[in-house]
A protein has these predicted regions:
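Short, flexible segments with low predicted structural confidence
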Residues: 1-2, 18, 34-35
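Short acidic/polar alpha-helix capping motifs at helix-coil junctions
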Residues: 2-6, 15-16, 93
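Short, well-ordered beta-strand segments in beta-rich or mixed alpha/beta enzyme
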Residues: 2-9, 40-68
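Short, surface-exposed ligand-recognition loops at beta-strand->loop->(often short) alpha-helix junctions
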Residues: 9-22
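An amphipathic, aromatic/His-enriched active-site/gating alpha helix that lines ligand/cofactor pockets
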Residues: 24-37, 56-90
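Short alpha-helical linear motifs
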Residues: 42-46, 77, 89-93
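Short, low-order "capping/linker" segments at domain edges
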Residues: 95-97
Length: 97
């Protein structure tokens, strides 16, 4: 299993809305692809302007097989649903043994 780890920065007062829109747009879009195993949302009370997403993939090849144009289309859809500033400020990849 491979973990895609993303740290998102968003205004604290918009954090809950961001999580809700992500669950509506991104999670179903990723779930359509082979290898998607699930997704977790982690929140740290010390950093109310940050959201951590833990996305579980069966293999890196399956994760990387998602076409860039598909990801761009989902990004556009998300930005229409959530038209506020947000940014991926850190990303990591982990292999689970």
């Amino acid at each position: 299993m491979v973990i895609e780890w993303l740290k998102i920065q968003v205004a604290p007062e918009l954090r809950e809305e961001f999580i809700q829109k992500d669950a509506i747009v991104w999670t179903p879009a990723l779930a359509k692809w082979d290898g998607f195993l699930g997704k977790e949302v982690w929140l740290d009370r010390q950093f109310p302007d940050q959201i951590i997403f833990i996305i579980h993939w069966q293999t890196k090849a399956q994760w990387q097989a998602i076409p860039e144009d598909y990801l761009a289309a989902i990004t556009r859809e998300f930005n229409q649903q959530f038209p506020y500033p947000s940014e991926i400020i850190e990303s990591q990849e982990y292999q689970v043994y």
